[in-house]
Amino acid sequence: MIRLDKEYSGRRLLDIDHPESPFGTKESPAVVQSYFDKRNIGCRGGEGEDGHDVVWFWLDKGKSFECPVCSQYFEHGPPDGHGDDEDHHH
């Protein structure tokens, strides 16, 4: 058994958080934040019996995606505090 001291001390492995949000619908999609124009996403469906094997897909800036298994909708969005109108670099 491999001991992951960081995990036991309460820190997440590699400090990677897995975003969790309400089930995305066409009217209210799950917004996936990213600094990049394209991001790889995995959909696991809903909770419990509504879950499914992970479906991987690319989510492009300005486009939405509907999971072909559970019909959950996803939308690409900027990280908090970084709007699309902020196209300047320091």
Swiss-Prot record:
Q: Which GO terms describe its cellular component?
A: mitochondrial envelope; respiratory chain complex IV
Q: Which family does it belong to?
A: Belongs to the cytochrome c oxidase subunit 5B (TC 3.D.4.11) family.
- The organism encoding this protein is Arabidopsis thaliana
Instruction: State the Gene Ontology terms under molecular function.
Output: metal ion binding
Full protein name: Putative cytochrome c oxidase subunit 5b-like
Q: Could you tell me the Gene Ontology terms of the biological process aspect for this record?
A: mitochondrial electron transport, cytochrome c to oxygen
Q: Which UniProt keywords apply?
A: Metal-binding, Zinc
Q: Which residues bind Zn(2+)?
A: 43, 67, 70
